A protein has these predicted regions:
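Terminal-proximal interaction/regulatory segments of ATP-powered molecular machines
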Residues: 432-437, 443-444, 480, 484-486, ...
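Short beta-alpha connecting loops at secondary-structure transitions
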Residues: 175, 229-237, 252-261, 321-328, ...
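Catalytic alpha/beta core domains of metabolic enzymes, predominantly
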Residues: 179-182, 188-308
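Generic long, charged, amphipathic alpha-helical segments
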Residues: 451-485
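Mixed-charge, glycine-accented linear interaction segment located at domain edges/termini
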Residues: 487-524
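A glycine-rich helix N-cap at a beta->alpha junction
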Residues: 66-73
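A mid-to-C-terminal "edge-of-domain" accessory segment
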Residues: 3-4, 10, 249, 255-425, ...
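Alpha/beta enzyme core
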Residues: 4-6, 16-41, 59-63, 78-200, ...
Length: 550
C-alpha cells in the first residue's frame, strides 16, 4: 500500500490565521497530540523570526516523540550573505531539529520584484542554501513557493528552480500553490510536468483561497505526491490551508492509501476539537468528517433510510474518524427521527402508536412557533415524557416577580421572588443576581434545594438569546438556549416567548426538571404525590405564566 507522508504546519502556517495565537504551552500540547495522531512531520515555526518559536524547539528537545519528526522553517539565504554566515540559515541549524524546511522563489515576478536579483542569482540562493543545510546533517525539505503561478508565467524557469534544489540534495521538493488560486486541472498538469523534470520525491502545499485546498491536495496525491502539507481544521492565513482532517480521511478512506493508519484515524475528530479549543475557536459544525453536523440527519425520509441502511445517506461509518451519527428533531422530522432520538436517549415508543404521532405533531407545532431542539435535547426528553408517559413535574409554580434596579452611577442589580409548591408545601424565596435571569436562576434553585438537594450542584454554564423576528423591535419573539451542568453531565434546554424573562424561565424549568427526572425518575399523572405541575406541553407555551412576572 502506498504511503503518503503527512506534514503538519498548524503551529506555523496555521497560527498565521486571523484570531489565532498559540502560547508556548499550547504549542507543546499540540506537538504531543499530533505525534499521537501519527503525522510524520511537525513544523514548529520559524526560529529566525521570533523567540517563542526558538524556545519551542528548545523545549521539544526534552519531549520524546513516538512517530513525528520536528521541522524548523525558514527561507533561502539572503542575497547579501553567504550561506554559512546567513543568520536565518544558522538559526535553522541551531534549532537542532532533524528536519529543516526552507522556501525559495519559483516565480520570476517574485525574484525580480521581491528579491530584486537576477534569475540566475536566485538559482544560486536555492543551491547554496540546500547544500549548506545538507552539510550540517539535516533532512532538507524544499518548498517551491508560488510554483504553480511561476509555472504559468515561465514554466522553464519554475522547473529550473526545482532542478537547482534537487542538484543540491533536497530530500523532498514541495510544490506550493501559495496564493491558493489554482484549479485542480492545472494542479494536475503542472505537478505531472514537475515529476517528469526531477526525480526527487514531490510533495504538495495548497491554500484555500479558491475553496480548492483539499481538492488540489488530493489531485496532487493522485498524480504522485508523496507528501501533503497542511493544517488541522484548515487554519491559516487569509482563507486558510488545506485541511488535514479532510486530506487524511480522504487518503485513508477514499484513495486506498496509507497516511496515519486506520487505527489512528479514529482520533481525528478528537484532535480536531482539541486544537480548536487551544486556538480558542469554536469548532466548525459543518466541517467534513469531524464536524458535529457531518453525520447529522434532519429530514424524516433520510432518517428512515439511515435506520435501514446507513450507507443510504452516509458516505462512511462515522466511527472510522471518531465521529458519531446524530438525528435532529425539527419541523422536518418524521416518526423515524422521533424513534431514533428516543432510542438514543433510552426512551421507548412504538412507531405505529398514537403517541408517536402526538409527539411529531407537537414538535412541528412548537418548531413553527420558534422552538428548536438542536442543542436542547434535554427539553426534548422532558417534552417526550410529558406527552408519551404523561408525567408531571415535581414542583408547581404559583408565580414569580423579577425587578431590576439602578441607582445613580452604580451597577444595576436584579432581584427575583418566586413562590412555588412541592407536594403541597409552599416555598416563597428571593434571590439577587447580576441580571434578571441570574436572579431567577438562583431563586429557583434556592427554593428547591431544601426538597431536592441534588440540584445544589447544578449551574448555568451558557446562555444564548436569538431574536426570531427582528421586525418586531422590542416586542420581537426570542429563543433562549441554556446549557446547564452538574459537574458530571451537561445538558441544553430551550424557551421561546415575546418576553425574554418568560423564555428564560421556560428553559430554566426544563433544566431543573431534567435533572430531577434523572435523580428521582418521572412522576406519572395520578400518582399519590401528584398535586400539581409546573407547566404543561405547550404550543409555544401560550398558557405559561403570562401573569407570573412583572
Amino acid at each position: 500500500m502506498r504511503k503518503v507522508q503527512i506534514y503538519d504546519t498548524t503551529l506555523r502556517d496555521g497560527s498565521q490565521g486571523e484570531s489565532i495565537s498559540f502560547s508556548l504551552e499550547d504549542k507543546l500540547h499540540i506537538v504531543r497530540k499530533l505525534d499521537e495522531l501519527g503525522v510524520d512531520y511537525i513544523e514548529g515555526g520559524w526560529p529566525g523570526s521570533n523567540n517563542k518559536d526558538l524556545e519551542l524547539f528548545q523545549q521539544t528537545q526534552r519531549v520524546t516523540l513516538q512517530h513525528a519528526r520536528m521541522a524548523a522553517f525558514g527561507s533561502t539565504r539572503h542575497p547579501r550573505y553567504q550561506a554559512d554566515s546567513d543568520p536565518n540559515l544558522n538559526a535553522l541549524v541551531e534549532a537542532n531539529t532533524p528536519v529543516v524546511t526552507i522556501f525559495g522563489k519559483s516565480w520570476d515576478l517574485h525574484v525580480k520584484t521581491a528579491l530584486g536579483i537576477t534569475l540566475d542569482e536566485n538559482l544560486d540562493l536555492i543551491r547554496e542554501s540546500v547544500a549548506f543545510l545538507k552539510s550540517r546533517g539535516k533532512e532538507v525539505i524544499y518548498d517551491a513557493e508560488h510554483y504553480f503561478d511561476g509555472f504559468k508565467a515561465d514554466l522553464d524557469y519554475a522547473l529550473a528552480t526545482l532542478k537547482a534544489a534537487e542538484e543540491a540534495g533536497a530530500h523532498t521538493i514541495v510544490l506550493c500553490d501559495t496564493n491558493g488560486g489554482t484549479l485542480t486541472s492545472d494542479i494536475q498538469e503542472r505537478f505531472v510536468r514537475a515529476s517528469r523534470h526531477v526525480s526527487t520525491p514531490l510533495g504538495i502545499h495548497t491554500h484555500n483561497d479558491s475553496e480548492m485546498g483539499v481538492a488540489n491536495a488530493i489531485v496532487a496525491v493522485q498524480a504522485g505526491a508523496m507528501q501533503v502539507q497542511g493544517t488541522i481544521n484548515g487554519y491559516g492565513e487569509r482563507c486558510g490551508n488545506a485541511n488535514l482532517c479532510s486530506v487524511i480521511a480522504n487518503i485513508e478512506l477514499k484513495l486506498g492509501m496509507s497516511s496515519i493508519g486506520k487505527e489512528n484515524l479514529r482520533q481525528l475528530t478528537e484532535v480536531s476539537h482539541y486544537i480548536s479549543e487551544l486556538a480558542n475557536l469554536l469548532p466548525r459544525t459543518d466541517q467534513a468528517y469531524v464536524g458535529k453536523s457531518a453525520f447529522a440527519h434532519k429530514g424524516g425520509i433520510h432518517v428512515s433510510a439511515v435506520m435501514k441502511e446507513t450507507a443510504a445517506y452516509e458516505h462512511i461509518d462515522p466511527a472510522l474518524v471518531g465521529n458519531a451519527r446524530r438525528v435532529l428533531v425539527s419541523e422536518l422530522s418524521g416518526r423515524s427521527n422521533i424513534l431514533y432520538k428516543a432510542a438514543e436517549r433510552g426512551l421507548k415508543i412504538d412507531k405505529s402508536s398514537a403517541a408517536a404521532k402526538i409527539v411529531v405533531d407537537k414538535l412541528k407545532e412548537m418548531e413553527h412557533y420558534g422552538y428548536q431542539f438542536e442543542g436542547a435535547e434535554a427539553s426534548f426528553e422532558v417534552l417526550f415524557d410529558r406527552l408519551v408517559h404523561e408525567t408531571k413535574d415535581l414542583f408547581e409554580l404559583d408565580g414569580f416577580r423579577v425587578i431590576t434596579e439602578k441607582k445613580g452611577a452604580g451597577e444595576p442589580y436584579s432581584e427575583a421572588v418566586i413562590k412555588l409548591r412541592v407536594d403541597g408545601a409552599e416555598e416563597h424565596t428571593a434571590a439577587e443576581g447580576s441580571g434578571p435571569v441570574s436572579a431567577l436562576d438562583r431563586a429557583l434553585r434556592k427554593s428547591l434545594t431544601t426538597f431536592f438537594p441534588c440540584i445544589r450542584n447544578v449551574r448555568l454554564t451558557d446562555y444564548k438569546v436569538r431574536v426570531l423576528n427582528s421586525e418586531g423591535g422590542t416586542n420581537a419573539k426570542v429563543r433562549v438556549l441554556i446549557e446547564s451542568s452538574d459537574g458530571q453531565e451537561s445538558w441544553g434546554t430551550v424557551g421561546v416567548s415575546e418576553n425574554l424573562i418568560e423564555a428564560s424561565w421556560q428553559a430554566l424549568v426544563d433544566s431543573i426538571t431534567y435533572k430531577l427526572k434523572k435523580e428521582h425518575g418521572p412522576r406519572k399523572k395520578g400518582s399519590p404525590a401528584d398535586k400539581a405541575t409546573a407547566s404543561e406541553p405547550r404550543p409555544g407555551r401560550k398558557e405559561a405564566v403570562g401573569s407570573q412576572h412583572s
